[in-house]
């Protein structure tokens, strides 16, 4: 299964397809096309159930993408409150800064996300 199929399934919340792909010995922490890991795509697209699954399979909660953006920053930038909550509960480093030099709290526009990050 290629990166495009996996990325589509991650972005669209097709958990059954992601499980099917990962059963075939896919590395949950591998870097996909575009320099991001599966967890980044799930966080960026607000796929909370997908995040839970990937984390249960050993996804690195603090893995940076090719730009130095973590899954927590991805979820924060896109305003996905539930994803931010899950990532924090699973040990995401809320003090890591993105390439713009801002932490998740500093980058957050959502008051609900800021409250979680305090």
UniProtKB/Swiss-Prot annotation:
Instruction: List residue spans for each ANK repeat.
Output: 1-30, 34-65, 67-98
Question: Where is the protein found, in the record's own terms?
Answer: Cytoplasm; Nucleus; Cytoplasm, Perinuclear region
- Pfam families registered for this protein in UniProt: Ank_2 (PF12796)
The GO cellular component terms are: cytoplasm; nucleus; perinuclear region of cytoplasm
> Which processes are annotated in GO (biological process)?
regulation of barbed-end actin filament capping
Protein keywords: ANK repeat, Cytoplasm, Nucleus, Repeat
Is Metal-binding there in the keyword field?
no
**Cross-referenced InterPro entries, in alphabetical order?**
Ankyrin_rpt, Ankyrin_rpt-contain_sf
Q: Which PROSITE patterns match?
A: ANK_REP_REGION, ANK_REPEAT
- Membership in a protein family: Belongs to the myotrophin family.
What does the UniProt function comment say about this protein? Answer: Regulates NF-kappa-B transcription factor activity. Promotes growth of cardiomyocytes, but not cardiomyocyte proliferation. Promotes cardiac muscle hypertrophy. Plays a role in the regulation of the growth of actin filaments. Inhibits the activity of the F-actin-capping protein complex.
Q: What is this protein called?
A: Myotrophin
Organism lineage: Eukaryota, Metazoa, Chordata, Craniata, Vertebrata
Question: Gene encoding this chain?
Answer: mtpn
């Amino acid at each position: 299964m290629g990166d495009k199929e996996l990325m589509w399934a991650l972005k669209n919340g097709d958990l059954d397809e992601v499980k099917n792909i990962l059963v075939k010995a896919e590395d949950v922490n591998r870097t996909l096309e575009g320099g991001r890991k599966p967890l980044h795509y799930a966080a960026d697209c607000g796929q909370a159930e997908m995040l839970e699954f990937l984390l249960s399979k050993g996804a690195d909660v603090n893995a940076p993408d090719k730009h130095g953006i973590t899954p927590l920053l991805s979820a924060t930038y896109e305003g996905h409150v539930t994803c931010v909550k899950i990532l924090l509960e699973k040990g995401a480093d809320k003090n890591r800064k993105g390439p713009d030099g801002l932490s998740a709290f500093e980058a957050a526009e959502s008051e609900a996300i800021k409250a979680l990050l305090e």
